[in-house]
Amino acid sequence: MENNNNDVQLIKIEAVVREEMFIDVKKALTDIGVNGITAYQVVGCGIQRGMSEYVRGQKVDVQVLPKIKFEIVVSSEEWERKTIEAIKKTAFTGNPGDGKIFTYYLKQAVKIRTGETGYDAIQTPNFDD
């Protein structure tokens, strides 16, 4: 039976972590073999609603805090589990604000340059060919 790579269910993982965890989380993902990562700076808050700081002696409630958001697309529940575990292990401090991880099933992925879709769109090319 022929294996159709486009029948693979793609899973998108979004992780929002502390800004200072960027390098460690990126390294952990690379170390387990994740080869496609999008990361960008965001601001946000959880149920704690940010934090309080003192500016010129006045208490100021900071409503949002700087974070890093990672977006990763994987091709199996095993990769989803491995990716989540790597992020959790690396980003954990045990304090409020460690972040959140969300997963979604993707309807489609398209590589703009080649037109490849689904599983084929997220694979790293072999530049030796």
Label each PLM-derived region with a short phrase.
Residues 1-129:
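Positively charged, small/polar-rich N-terminal and surface patches that mediate targeting and assembly
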